[in-house]
């Protein structure tokens, strides 16, 4: 995202809600329609049995009739369309929309964490049971939130986190404000480096600190002062050093890269996931397909920025760069999809208000995907890129019982995914 900034007030009311939402463990779920995301076929009258200890599915079978006196750990969704919990592969849950970067100079990690708790709850209730959070300015806020959710202290989606950005001085991952260059506090410059050896050390720091993946800023950014989206920032040598270090432990590396050259350099350096990919060219598309690299193309938020940017306090520089990248990114999304490149669902939540994640589905279908392909991008394909393809993304025996339910068929109307009626994560109904 890298980034205009965020509102740090107006969160206290939600903190209580995020940390104390009541949930109920389920052992049997009766789904009138259950989507097989591989085939696109709806199974009728599916009974999902859940192991209450592991939160995983024991069995998916059929039922003839739903009992009129179900126990409290059974759920009747016989009039609903059920599908796997959704996965957003590009979020910034600890941040809210605003336009004043200077606030990052004084906000504490505790204040940032309060914002994250509120947004985690909102995101889960929108049907997203897993997110890949791809960077925070206040280092390790995301890890603390992840751990609270795992411990059931806080309500939210399953989180995979980056810890902090790896970026060059003054790059797209820096909070650099004209006139305040000398005032940037050290605690929001944890991932700033220059040179292959320095970036290797930063990668070690991310890994040893307990992050799930590494996020590096290979190109300039739309929402950062003086940073040009089409221009490379990290060198191939710097990127390679990070990838080499990551390979030692099997941790995955994803690269923020708008520009065509940056995308190709990142792929050739061994990165397996590209964020944004706005200006990707034909050679980059071919390289991505050949090397099994996934693209996370946030094709919704350009409209939000264009419509609300001034209200949110964004400077004209950011708005201009957004105008220059929005439509070309959508055209390249269509080209990459037609070429058979793996595209995952990722929205850059935090650029727009959290909870609106599902609005991106209709943009993906407008620009070349079928409804089923867009759903697959947010389920089975995303789980593959996360390395969790045997745990999430499908409603099958042995998988976590992550299930959402809605009243209308999303294969007919993709916007149905913007109105989720029930959210179940690891067998818990929220």
Regions found by a protein language model. Give the residues of each.
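Bacterial Sec-dependent N-terminal signal peptides
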Residues: 1-25
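Histidine-rich, glycine-flanked metal-binding segment
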Residues: 27, 34, 38-83
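Metal-associated gating/positioning segment near the N- to mid-region
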Residues: 80-147, 151-153, 169-170, 237, ...
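Active-site gating loops and adjacent loop-to-helix segments of metal-dependent hydrolytic enzymes
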Residues: 95-112, 172-188, 222-235, 294-326
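Histidine/acidic-residue-rich catalytic or RNA/ligand-binding cores of hydrolases
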Residues: 98-101, 142, 225-226, 263-269, ...
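His/Asp/Glu-enriched, well-ordered alpha-helical/loop segment
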Residues: 106, 248, 317, 324-409
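Divalent metal-dependent hydrolysis catalytic cores, especially in the metallo-beta-lactamase
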Residues: 116-140, 155-165, 211-222, 252, ...
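Histidine/acidic residue-rich metal-binding segments in metalloenzymes
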Residues: 144, 198-218, 222-294, 323-343, ...
